[in-house]
Each structure stands twice: as structure tokens, then as C-alpha cells.
Amino acid sequence: ESLIGWMVEDMRCGIDLLVSREGVDSKRIIVMGAVAGGGDPAGVTAAVDDRVAVAVPFNFGGPQPESPYPLPEDVETSFNYLGGGSWESTRNLKGTAPGGFFHWAIVGSLAPRRLVYAHEFSWDRERDPVWKRLQSIWSWYEKAENLGFAHGHGLLRGDAKTASHCNNIGPVHRKM
């Protein structure tokens, strides 16, 4: 039992309810997880529930708002793929390091379903090592068209005028 386990089970019960309703197309279920911890349960739920056709897990699997921007040139070898100890207990998934259970692998397990790899702030697409991995995974399935992205602007330490701080998936993030 864990907080993430409870959250994922709650989301799966929500999907059960949706698909039990008349008029709901069970093949078009989308799970979106906004920033500040919502992306984690959205990503894990989509990974364990194949009824999810599209997932939009914000800030889960790759660089975090706290990551340097732009990413360093040696990011392939210097990036912390395990993530740091976080105050958000959903990010500290049990068994991540010893089991090789990296967040990007959870996100990658969604292939070949549709994924929007989403970031709250500016995103260094060219150097993001996880984006490169996700592109490879979706290409193995010959489903590159099922992989998209969304991102905001500015940095974590900016103000509302210079950065897309949010607690939901805002208009700036819906411009892919």
C-alpha cells in the first residue's frame, strides 16, 4: 500500500464508472495529470490500465521544473534518471532504483498508445534524454504519430509574467 497506489486505484475506479455509463466510448479514455503531483498518478494509471487511450502526465518521466534550463551538454550521462528525493511522496516510487523502475520507463510502457509528454515550463527538447528514449520506443512500434508534447514557457523561479506557473493544464499548454 502506498499513496500512489491509492491514487491510481481511485483513478481506475473513475474509469470503471465512466465506461459503465451509456454513451461513453471506452476506446477514447484520456487521463491528464496536471502539475504539482498530478502527472505522476496519471502516468502510473495509464501504465497499468490499458483502457487509457491517451495520457498527458505533466512533469513525469523526464526533466523537472527544478532541472537546469537549458540542460547541460553531457545530459545523457549526468541526468538523474531516478529523480531526487521529493516532498511529493508520489514521486518517490518504491523500488525505483533497485528494480530499474525509472519514471521514464513507466511513461515508455504506454507505447504504442498515445502520449503527450508535457512540461509546465520551458523544455529543452533537443537535449532531453528521456524524449530521445520515448521517440525510440514509439518508433519500434512504428507509431511515432502517437507521441506528442506540450510545454509552457519561462522557468520555475519566474513570475506570472515571465513563466507559465500553473496548477492545471492551462491555455499555454494546449498549444502543441
Q: What does each model-found stretch correspond to?
A:
Residues 32, 58-59, 152:
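Alpha/beta-hydrolase-fold catalytic nucleophile elbow
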Residues 33-46:
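Glycine-rich nucleophile elbow surrounding the catalytic serine of serine-hydrolase chemistry
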Residues 1-2, 26, 39, 94-103:
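Active-site-adjacent structural elements in folded domains
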